[in-house]
Amino acid sequence: YLSSGQEDLRGANGIVIVDGQVKVDGVSGGQELLLYKDGTIGTAAGVSASELVNRGVKYTFSCHSTQMIQNGDTSPSYREPKSYKRTCIGQTTNGDYYITTDLGYGNKLSSTAEYLKSLGCVNANSLDQGGSVTLTRNSEVINNPSDSSGERYVGDFLYFV
């Protein structure tokens, strides 16, 4: 389903919640992807990890997340002047998820948000951009990460089984 890849938490920045348990306490910076017990995705700024667990957060993902769509409304925070390679996740009312990976430099968050809305997504977040935009299938990388050194190491990942 969805899982946090954080195993060695000594260098973790911000907050870490795994399976509803606070692993690194602190205050959310608003750029973590939150996965609630009911499967809803979102972000929250200025909230302690303990309070997020009380609100039903099951996992946090450290991914420089920006909420593009919240409860069917396009969020004004997604507007940005540049286009980047990026990965985004959207969620429909029936709980289905869509993952998009933009491999070119022609898409802004606004166009990706509109695309996810056209698929019926009522919540959507960008996850990260640049060299961390790595798409795999059956353990094989199927895109070309943009950093000159190849894939960028990241502390978290999403996977679907």
Residue ranges: model-predicted function:
Residues 1-161:
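Gly/Ser/Thr/Pro-rich low-complexity, intrinsically disordered segments
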